[in-house]
Amino acid sequence: MIMAKPESTSASMQQSSAQKTDCEQPRAIGEGQQAGRLLQNRLELVEDLWQTVLRSECPPDQAERLLRLKQLSEPLALEGADENSASRAIVLLIQEMDLAEAITAARAFSLYFQLVNILEQRIEEDSYLASMSSGKENNRQDKPYDPFAPPLATQTDPATFRELFERLRRLNVPPAQLETLLQEMDIRLVFTAHPTEIVRHTVRHKQRKVASLLQQFQSDPTKSTSEKESLRLQLEEEIRLWWRTDELHQFKPSVLDEVDYALHYFQQVLFDAMPQLRRRLITAMAESYPDVHIPQAAFCTFGSWVGSDRDGNPSVTPEITWRTACYQRQLMLERYVNAVQKLRDQLSISMQWSQVSTPLLESLEMDRLRFPEVYEERAARYRLEPYRLKLSYTLERLKLTQHRNQQLAEAGWQTPPEGLNPSPNLINAGEALHYKSVAEFRSDLELIRNSLVSTDLSCEPLDTLLNQVHIFAFSLASLDIRQESNRHSDALDELTRYLNLPKAYGDMAENERVQWLMEELQTRRPLIPSAVIWSPSTAETVAVFRMLHRLQEEFGSRICRTYVISMSHTVSDLLEVLLLAKEAGLVDPAAGHAELLVVPLFETVEDLQRAPAVMEALLSSPVYRNLLPRVSEQVQPLQELMLGYSDSNKDSGFLSSNWEIHQAQIALQDLANRQGVALRLFHGRGGSVGRGGGPAYQAILAQPSGTVRGRIKITEQGEVLASKYSLPELALYNLETFTTAVLQNSLVTNQLDATPSWNQLMTRLAGRSREHYRALVHNNPDLVAFFQQVTPIEEISKLQISSRPARRKSGAKDLSSLRAIPWVFGWTQSRFLLPSWFGVGTALAAEVESDADQLDLLRRLHQRWPFFRMLISKVEMTLSKVDLDLAHHYMTSLGREDYREAFNRIFEIIETEYSLTRRLVLNITGQPRLLAADPALQLSVDLRNRTIVPLGFLQVALLRKLRDQNRQPPMNDAGDGRTYSRSELLRGALLTINGIAAGMRNTG
């Protein structure tokens, strides 16, 4: 046996696993009951496939025990039964398992949850397609105006383009206002790697194959019985192959592995999805606003931190960032080569039967002189087909650009341009023949398009390609550099000590630092000697800026123009980066020129509160202000600021973090208005509620009025990429709801923004919540031990899932060194989910107890204020996932005896707060139970409710064995003849972590 009987397994197991993921999972569109029926109908197939695979892959007696375990954990099995007895039966069944069978059980339940996740994704995709189809049938005459409908500003259900534009038309939003916003709109989605991305890329590939087969199986009801049987056999075969694939990473992925993983979504989905998004926008606009012109420029683009985020990740070197840029460029060039080849095949227009524009003919003559070999080869064939000839020249230039890019990747960033040895065909009469910028490529395509238009022709593939060029350019996604603020101050301290200045930088007070930095910025004298051997840290810091200059020199500024400073506290934190950038040639304050956008990241509550004062000091400085970029000559200078959800939540709890970020946005926008500066807020949202996650549509609508204005930048965490961008229609759903939310927030003045009394109420709630949270998390001396012993945090750190360490400082065990992502991951695995709700109940209770009328006020806020409704919705969703019975089992089984009394006190605090929070959330929403207002989500809750519990029991048993310091391996229990090593036990524990993450649809 591998498990001792738990000391406490009580009845409810709550609504535990329930899981609509904290991360952005698109809700099924339409009535919840309809989505629920879809799930029920299709679940039968998935469960049957799962059982078939287990019976074919496991010994008969083992397969039956696994199926029995699943049956015991189903909600329907508990109707009219004693839930305690079901829990005991689960425990007894697990007790009979040896380690090998326990590992098989963990794998089986992990597979089950991943199949259900795929099923739900398919339902979400099908629901979106159904909504698009029904939307086409329901024109505006079918929907008379409803005077009793809630104001648009308070509607937080995701809207399609068609729905939103019709609402805007009814609200008499002027076409000119909408057109102006579209011209200025700038949505940026920034993909990140994720330190707890749990699923191997190989397994992701298997999941996509299963999803594709499920789509084929279910999409066409006219398929014959034999066709369906064939597809079912393919599904069984693919799932069996998946079952025989190792779920765990065999080695720690490199940064370039992570780059490849992130770029997969561009290759497979986004490159083709973005033009579809634009077409849907144009079609919907034509129905409600036929006179509005949609600009060609991209309204939604992408960024990436994968390969460029070096904060706490020593593996991200300047060379890695350089290679990442080259890799992204090569991927785009390959796509463009393929697209141009297809266009050449299609545009067979002959000059005998069609006019051709003069500019196009003139360009062909220039191309003939530059590419005589191409002319010799193609002229005879395409003599009367100018478009094919032009595209042949275009294709040649793209291939030369590919060749140049390959040289750059191989040579590395430290090789100067003159150090490259280009092939002779790259140069003709001293002119470089490859595309030196994407503008040159776009110009060639526009020449072709303009010529076609002048003869009353259009070409949708060409329009699609031009749209892709506007969105992705040659870079695919802009790389943001991120580094922690201390790295820059440490480098300047070492530099000033070497220069033997009267006072070293590290010894200066903040006002002295600012004065010295300003003086250095305004001089043209170099500061950094070139022939000095610095410490490795300083050498790398300086090298990053030099690499950036070389990168922009070769690829243009679009590839990498943003530098994010994490843990920004003061004015000097930004000026330090500007000075280092000046030394590398990225910034010239004397000329008022900058090729780098310096972005402070304010993360802790104190820094969020301090942010307006820091930025006011900077924006009041002519030196700093002159270095802000301008989007165009007519637009104000742009300041980008990043707001950190993860660390502020870890620092002060969910409610306080969200309110401080909300308040900071208002104060920063007021400052920008006074200073005449355009503000772009960069939201560092994580996948989980404890790190700012949740439905993006609601989150964007909950932003204070006037803070979006068509500009927003948001991180898309690595762990949510598969759930949002693995399927084309899911990707379109997310992209469309992002866009409609930005449009709605920007165009519809929210008449229900917070009143002064609401602000005062929220300030009180945030303060009380923060106080209660910090009393437990930061001031309780036993909390760190509780977290380390009761959650699988140490085992999580052993998962080979990321190039980035889980802790900021190697070997450190304190809370401050632990990153926010594994902090949330640990609490999620053990079913506390504490960072996402703790402190909320105490704050709400204090308000209600002070005045009974405050409950009515809180209910009104929930109905009328999108920000408050978003908060309560997130807390409600999180509470539905908490399972304190299972969490108590973690504590009693894994906590050391000498901590028992202290841990019991901590658990009592958590349990009391949970009950209080749950009661008050239900009082505010007016619902009889959590998630009662969302039937589709509730069905998902019921589906996963207890099914995840056996994995929790298995995990505890394996962790207990693994951590038992009094029994060194090999281990042996009565009735178990096998000998186990620690590596085998660790493997089993890690598999349960995989399974629970799949069941929760969330890690950190």
From Swiss-Prot:
One MF term in the entry's GO annotations: phosphoenolpyruvate carboxylase activity
Region (Disordered): 1-25
Compositional bias (Low complexity): 8-19
Catalytic residues, chain numbering: 194, 650
Keywords: Carbon dioxide fixation, Lyase, Magnesium
Cofactor: Mg(2+)
Reaction catalysis annotation: oxaloacetate + phosphate = phosphoenolpyruvate + hydrogencarbonate
PROSITE patterns reported for this sequence: PEPCASE_1, PEPCASE_2
Cellular compartments per GO CC: cytosol
Biological processes, Gene Ontology terms: carbon fixation; oxaloacetate metabolic process; tricarboxylic acid cycle
InterPro entries per UniProt: PEP_COase (IPR021135), PEP_COase_bac/pln-type (IPR022805), PEP_COase_Lys_AS (IPR018129), PEPCASE_His_AS (IPR033129), Pyrv/PenolPyrv_kinase-like_dom (IPR015813)
UniProt-listed Enzyme Commission number(s): 4.1.1.31
Any Pfam family matching the protein: PEPcase
Keyword Transcription: no
The keyword Heme appears for this protein: no
Function field: Forms oxaloacetate, a four-carbon dicarboxylic acid source for the tricarboxylic acid cycle.
Record-stated family: Belongs to the PEPCase type 1 family.
Name of the protein in question: Phosphoenolpyruvate carboxylase
Gene name linked to the record: ppc
